[in-house]
C-alpha cells in the first residue's frame, strides 16, 4: 500500500464514496443560505444557517437523512461538481478539481477540525439560526473572504 494519501494519488472520479465524503472539511459554508438575483443570476451569500446545521460544531444534525428534512439541501457529487461555481476557494472538492493541494489546516492533514476553526474557515463565528431571521436580505454578507 502506498504512503501517498488517496487524494494525491486518485482523481475525484476514482475515489470511493467514503474517500469522497472525507474530503469535506465540515466548515458549514455549504449550509449557509444563498440568494440569487433573478435578473442577473448573481449569488449573494448570507450568514443564515440551515435549520439542520449545528452552528457550534458546523455539522448537520441529520446528515444521512438530510433530504427528508431539507429537500433543497445540496448534494455535491462528482457529476455535478462543476455546477457549484460558488464553492469557497478553500473547499477540498474545488481545490482538487483544480489540481491544487489541500490547505494546511484541512482535517485530513491535521487529524481534527481545530485548525480549520482556528483559521476561521468554518461558519460558526458568523452563522445565525434561520429561525431567528426575519428578512434574509438583511443578512447578505459582503463577499466572504472564503468565497474569493
UniProtKB/Swiss-Prot annotation:
InterPro entries: Puta_zinc/iron-chelating_dom, UCP006173. Transmembrane segments: none annotated. Belongs to the UPF0260 family. This is UPF0260 protein YcgN.
Amino acid at each position: 500500500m502506498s504512503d501517498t494519501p488517496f487524494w494525491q494519488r486518485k482523481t475525484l472520479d476514482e475515489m470511493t464514496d467514503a474517500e469522497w465524503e472525507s474530503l469535506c472539511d465540515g466548515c458549514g459554508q455549504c449550509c449557509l443560505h444563498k440568494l440569487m438575483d433573478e435578473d442577473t443570476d448573481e449569488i449573494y451569500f448570507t450568514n443564515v444557517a440551515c435549520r439542520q446545521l449545528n452552528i457550534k460544531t458546523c455539522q448537520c444534525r441529520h446528515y444521512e437523512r438530510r433530504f427528508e428534512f431539507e429537500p433543497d439541501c445540496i448534494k455535491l457529487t462528482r457529476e455535478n461538481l462543476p455546477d457549484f461555481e460558488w464553492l469557497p476557494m478553500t473547499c477540498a472538492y474545488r481545490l482538487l478539481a483544480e489540481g491544487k493541494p489541500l490547505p494546511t489546516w484541512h482535517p485530513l492533514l491535521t487529524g481534527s477540525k481545530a485548525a480549520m476553526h482556528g483559521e476561521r474557515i468554518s461558519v460558526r463565528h458568523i452563522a445565525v439560526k434561520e429561525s431567528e431571521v426575519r428578512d434574509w436580505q438583511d443578512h447578505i454578507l459582503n463577499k466572504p473572504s472564503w468565497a474569493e
